[in-house]
Structures are given as C-alpha cells and as structure tokens.
Amino acid sequence: MTIITLPYTYLTTLIGTDKETILDRLPMIGSDIERIEDDHADVEFFPDRPDLFSTEGVARAMRGFLGIETGSVTYEVKPSGVSFTIDPALKEIRPFLGSAVIRGLSLSEEAIQSLMGLQEALHWAIGRGRKKMAIGLHDLDKITPPFRYCAAEKSRSFVPLDFTEPMTMEQMLDEHPKGRAYAHLVREHPRYPLIVDAEDRVCSFPPIINGDLTRVTTETKNILLDTTGTDQRAVEVTVKIVCAALVEAGGTVESVTIDGVESPDLSPSVRTVSVDEGNKLLGLSLTAPEMATLLEKMRFKATPDGTDRIRVEVPCYRADIMHDWDIFEDVAVAYGYENFDATLPETSTIGEQSQVSVIGGAVREILTGLGYHEVMPFTLTSETVTYDLMQRERSPTALHLLHPITEDQTIVRTDLLPLLLELLQMNRYRELPQRIFCTGDVVEGISTHQKAAAVSCHGAADFSEAYAAADALCRDLNLPYTTAESTDPAFIDGRRGDIIVDGTTVGVFGEISPRVILGFELDHPIAAVELDLRAVRAHRDQRDRS
C-alpha cells in the first residue's frame, strides 16, 4: 500500500471544491484516509492505481467522480526538437529509456513535493526499488540538447543532488545516501549509466541520483523527464503517468526523439465491453447510456454502441486496466458501493481455522524461535527464477499468466525456495548471517497447496544446519520422520535429503548448489529446508483416524 500526502490548499485548487467534500468522498474512489491534519491528509492507495500516487492524479480522478469534469483528458503531444541517443553498451546494464519534455509550468513548493512523492511511490510500486525503472526530472533550461544516455567510466565525476562538491560515480555508491541505498543495482557492472547533455554536462546517474545542476525549483518552467530501466513496459507506463500528472500541474507535453523513435505515446487504448456482462457481474440493470455515464465519471471516454456494447477509451495513465472486468469495477465505484442492495446469504455457517493454517502457524513459531525472520515474497514470479536459476527443468504444470505485465511475473509460484533465494539476492550487500523463511500457497496445474521454506546464508552455512532446522521442525510438529539421500540439481550432490513420514516425502533439506548460488549473484553457502504442509496435514489426519 502507498501512502501519499495531500495538501488541502493545492488539492482544493486543482479540484475546485471544498476540503470537507473531498475528504467525505475520497474513500469512495478506493482510498483509505490514514491521518487528517490541519493542512493536509495522509491517504493510502492500493498499488494497482499508480496514477493516484500524486495530488494531481487524485485531483483528476475526484473532478470526474464529483461530476465537475467528466470524460477523458485529451493529450496533444507536439515535437520538442529534443533528442536522445542510447549507447549500445547499456544493453546489458540498463537498456531502456523513456523521455518527454513538459513546458509552461509554474510550480509551487506543494507541486514540487507532490512530484517528488509521485517519483518515490512509482519507484516502489512499478520500479521494484528502482530496479525495473527509475525517474529523473530536470530543469531543461539549465542544460543543452541533444542528450546522450551512455555507459560511463566509474571515475567520471559530477556534483550530485544536495551536495556541493563533485564526487566520482564510484564514490557516490559509498558516500551518498542514495548511492548506498541503490548501489546493488549497478555496482557489478564495469561501467555505469549516465545521462549527459550536448556540452557533456551530467544530468543524471540513473538509477542512483540526479546532478545538482538540473535541480527542479519553483523557478523551473520547463522540465526534461527521463525514465530508465530494465523493463520496457515499466519505463513506458511511468512516463505516461508522470506526464499526465504534470499536465494537471499546468504543463504541456512535447515528445522526445530517442534513437529515431518518438516518446511518449499518450493516446488512449480502446476496448469494447458488454453491458449485459457488466450487469450480470455487478447485479445491476443499467442501460448502455447509464453505464457510459458512470464510466465518464471515472475519466473514461465511453460511447454506447447499440444496446449491449460500449466503446471505451482507456486513458494512457490507466496501466491497471487489463480486462473488461477492470472497467466494470470502475462502474461499481462510480455507481457507489453504498448504493448496492445488501442481501443476507441463504445459508449460515460457522468458520474455523483450517488445519493447514494451524500447522503453518506452528511452523512460523518454530522457525522464529530458531532465529529466522519471516518474509512474504510475491505470488507471481518467472520461469527464470523458478527453474532456470535453480538448474531445474521447466515444468509443464506451471500456471502461466495470459497477459503478463512484466517478464518478472509470468507464472504463479510453484515453489518457495527460489523466491527466498531471490530475496537473498536483493539483500546481498546486507550484513550476514541472513536467515529468512516464508509459508504460503503454491500452485501446480489447478492444484493449490501450502508449503513452508527457510534458508540460511552465511560463511558457515552447511548441510548440518539444514538438518538441524529440519529436525527441529519435525520434532516440534510431532512428526516421526526418517531421512533418505536424494538428488536435485538445485542442491549439492550428496548434501540433500528427503524428510519421510509414514513412507511419504513431506519435505527436503540440504545445501544449495554453488551453480545456483552464483546464478542468484550470491557469494556464500546456503542451507535450506522445505516442508509440504499438505503432506504434513495428511499424516495428522491419518493419525487422528487411527
């Protein structure tokens, strides 16, 4: 969840109504007001609506929801004459670049704070901690086009933002706060990404820090936006969201030529939805014009096409719209959840905690007692992480996403160990030892069940530590187990064992293979243990029956 600060003065100016009305209706568009202060409110939004991570984005949505300004915003993008070239050497470092010029701005301190907040929120929600995408905002009048996005020597120096003396790029990774926080994204590469202008002045060292030369202030009238990353869609979506926010702040967007290609494309996408399908899903009886009117409140352009079809133009900044049902969800928001009729279920049942959840809770207590810290990795992952980096064959039973947003999230997780190793990779520059675990659902084919997994990473991690964790789990779960040597390319030969209960394998333990460790860019031995909680429950059920 993302919390943003909404200053009342700026927000009411953008929306055109009073604070009380805004605070009363704001939760209706999918927000949770965390805190109300004298001059601002802190509001939480779900990460699937990154277009609402700024005061400008909230104002745009609220104007529609309140009926002040409905329908979609038309973005007229003219050529700026500004161009970028990309160094081919960046292909293996940080290959993708998006850009735009925004002119005619008159920024207040509140507007600047809103843009900085949007920048950081997008770094988290879309950029995955700046790995997939990072944003730079520059005062265009302080630099000279054309610009180059190049791979520079680590010894290149410039004055970073909020500093007064030049530093080398290598120094920044050790001495600048942002450098220390994000050094792991670039340190392994022989050269670092850099954006320079026609006079070879540094604009930015993405994804670390901008140069102080291009600092955006209340005097800034024209902005150069750059978005770099390792994921092209994340880069493109981010450019659209930031451009749309800056239009709300009073700017006009102009395109930038990147190696001959114009950026950005702010045209809407078009979908045709069924009124009948929407009514069945929501339990309503809306006509096509009525549903179109509701969609206009949500800032779509909606045109009835007969009695059962609506042509919907989806704004460029709505990256969350991937299915017709996403549009119907906005119909429900505009209709008002408070206006739906409440009905009681025909049957009444009394719930209780499932046995698998009980076992999962016991596993968490045991591993916490052993010094492991619980983490919650994503449910979506990729075949690269799940199979390729684990040196395993790809499984035909993996559940694939039909329309994945990124190459990092193409399947539903089938295992937990790869995700724990990925988390170790993300934290590889942190202090050792690192001991983490997780419990949760995995999916194979159409079967969903729960597993638990734990890893320990440090210089002395070995098979004995993995066995000790497995023994503690089985002992405290009252599992009469035996072990048997087994093989798996993810583990070192001769250092992997199955946990067997009543002739059934319920888990594994062992020492991770050096090939896997190196694949995840780690440098230390790793001990691992994994339990199939479904199998543990089956044993308990059989024991209880006998």
Curated annotation (Swiss-Prot):
Q: What InterPro entries does the record point to?
A: aa-tRNA-synth_II/BPL/LPL (IPR045864), B3/B4_tRNA-bd (IPR005146), DNA-bd_dom_put_sf (IPR009061), Phe-tRNA-ligase_IIc_bsu (IPR045060), Phe-tRNA-synth_IIc_bsu_arc_euk (IPR004531), Phe-tRNA_synthase-like_B3/B4 (IPR020825), Phe_tRNA_ligase_beta2_arc (IPR022918), PheRS_beta_core (IPR041616)
One cellular component (GO) term of this entry: phenylalanine-tRNA ligase complex
Which cofactors must be present for this protein to function? Mg(2+)
List keywords of the entry alphabetically.
Aminoacyl-tRNA synthetase, ATP-binding, Cytoplasm, Ligase, Magnesium, Metal-binding, Nucleotide-binding, Protein biosynthesis
Task: Tell where it localizes.
Answer: Cytoplasm
- Its GO biological process terms? phenylalanyl-tRNA aminoacylation
The signal peptide here is none
NCBIfam families (alphabetical): pheT_arch (TIGR00471)
Give the superkingdom in one word: Archaea
Which chemical reaction does it catalyze? tRNA(Phe) + L-phenylalanine + ATP = L-phenylalanyl-tRNA(Phe) + AMP + diphosphate + H(+)
Protein family membership = Belongs to the phenylalanyl-tRNA synthetase beta subunit family. Type 2 subfamily.
The record's GO molecular-function terms, alphabetically, read: ATP binding; magnesium ion binding; phenylalanine-tRNA ligase activity; RNA binding
Q: Which PROSITE patterns match?
A: B5
How it assembles, according to the record, is:
Tetramer of two alpha and two beta subunits.
Task: State the name under which the record lists this protein.
Answer: Phenylalanine--tRNA ligase beta subunit
Q: Where is the B5 domain?
A: 266-342
Main localisation, per the record? Answer: cytoplasm
- Per the UniProt record, one Pfam family is B5
EC number(s) recorded for this UniProt protein:
6.1.1.20
Q: Residues that bind Mg(2+), according to the entry? A: D320, D326, E329, D330
